[in-house]
Regions:
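Structured alpha/beta reader/binder surfaces that contact nucleic acids or chromatin modification marks
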Residues: 2, 6-126
Length: 126
């Protein structure tokens, strides 16, 4: 078991803490490709400034345990197969959830690396 650090915007972190967000979608690259079931992720509470720029925020705001990792080709494939509300609780449809991811990750990168549905379980609020 390894312990990782990663940031989440405040609203998504709140969704994780109350159990609405149980699946984290990421490209299958970098540290996310190294995640394993049983690993712990210490989450930072990141925030956007008035210009919309994302900044690292409060460290150790919450901890989650990785309980499953599923592989998909694209984010649309992921949100069609997973409960999209467990991925993006604020989304009103599968298409809206996929579009949110498409704003961050190009289709080229999705096709190159593939996508991970990282199922998480909230374990503590340090």
């Amino acid at each position: 078991m390894r312990v990782w650090e990663s940031g989440r915007e405040s609203n998504l972190l709140d969704d994780i803490i109350v159990g609405r967000k149980t699946i984290e979608g990421r490209l299958n690259r970098g540290k996310f490709a190294e995640y394993s079931v049983g690993d712990i992720v210490s989450l930072r509470r990141d925030y956007r400034d008035t210009k919309g720029i994302l900044h690292d925020g409060e460290p150790d705001a919450a901890q989650v345990k990785i309980v499953a990792i599923r592989h998909y080709k694209t984010f649309i494939d992921m949100v069609e197969s997973e409960n999209y509300k467990s991925v993006i609780p604020s989304a009103n449809s599968v298409k809206e959830a996929a579009t949110i991811y498409d704003n961050y990750y190009s289709m080229g990168d999705q096709n190159k690396y593939g996508v991970l549905a990282i199922e998480i379980e909230y374990i503590t609020e340090p």
